[in-house]
C-alpha cells in the first residue's frame, strides 16, 4: 500500500509537538499557570499561533492525562445562545473519545437539551442541537457549569476569540460568565483573543467584570533563526533547504506571522523546483502562485464593498500600516474625502477587512493586502 507523505508544514489545526515550531517558553508558562489553577488571558494578533499554543499545552503529558481539555472558537457567534451552543458542542467533542461513562455523565446534566441529543448507529452521541433548541440559555449554561464543577477530572476550557462576547446584544454576558467561572472550582480557563485593545479593556479595566481575573500572556513572532532551523529540519525530508536570505525575505514579508509563513513553506515543500537550495525567487514565485489561486475568491470578497470602501481598502493596503486615515497627506495621496473615509472605515472594521491595533490600521489578510498592492 502506497504511503502518502505528510507535509510537515501544518496550516490548519494541530498535529503533534513534532510539527509545532518552538514556543517552548510560552508552552511552559501557560502549562504552569493552568496547573497552578490560574485563568489566563492570551492576547495576540490573529494567525500568530494562539490556538496552536493552546493545543500544544493540552498535549503536555501532565495536562493530557490529568485534565479534560476543551477548546472552542466563538469568532462566528452572535449572541449568548450561540455561545452556549458552541460550549456544549465543544465539551461533547472533547469527551466522546474518553468513553461512554464520561460523555454520558455530561449529557445527563443537560436536562434542558436531553430530548435534542441524537445517537449514531454505534450508539455514540451527536450534537444535533440547533440554536433554536436552546430556549433558555441561562439554564443550559448553568447545567454546563454544573458539569464542569462535578466532572471526574478537572477541566481546562479554552475560549478562542473571547472578545466576541463584548459585542453580543445581551449586555450582561461578561458578568454572567464571570460569576459562573468564579464559582466553578473544578475548571480553569484560557481566554484567547486577537483584538488586543478590546481584550486589554476586558481584563484591565476596573469597570469590567473580568478585571484582574486572569494572568495576562502575550505572544510575539517566533524567533527568525529558530523558525529557519525548524523549516530546514523538515525540508530536509524532501531533500530541500531554504537559504537564510530567502527565509529572511519570507519572514519579514509577513511580519513573522506564523500562518502565512507556514502556508508558503507548505507550498515550497512540494514545489517542482529542481533546486535543492531554495532561493528568494522560489519564495517570490510561490507567493505569486498563492495569490493567483486566491484571485477569484478575493474578487468575490471585494464585490461586497462599495467603490469608496474598496478605494479605502486599497489605499490602506498600498500604505502598509497608516497611523491616521484622516491626515491631509493620506487623503490627498489617495484622492479620498474625509466623509468617505469616516463612513467606509467603520464598515471595513466591522466586516474584519481591516484591524486597528497599536495605533495603526492594516488589512487582516496579508495575502489580500499583497494582491491589492499588485493591482
What role is predicted for each listed range?
Residues 247-253, 259-273, 311-314, 346:
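C-terminal helical "lid" of AAA+/P-loop NTPase domains
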Residues 38-39, 44-48, 52-156:
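P-loop NTPase nucleotide-binding core
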Residues 201-252, 274-276:
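Helix-loop-helix "sensor" segment of P-loop NTPases
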Residues 34-35, 163, 255, 269, ...:
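Short, locally clustered residues in the helix-turn-helix/winged-helix DNA-binding domain
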Residues 1-40, 45, 355, 375:
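A short, basic N-terminal segment
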Residues 2, 6-7, 292, 296-375:
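C-terminal leucine-rich, beta-strand-based interaction scaffolds used for sensing/assembly
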Residues 127-196, 204:
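Conserved Walker B catalytic segment
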Residues 271-293:
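Conserved C-terminal helix/linker of AAA+ ATPases
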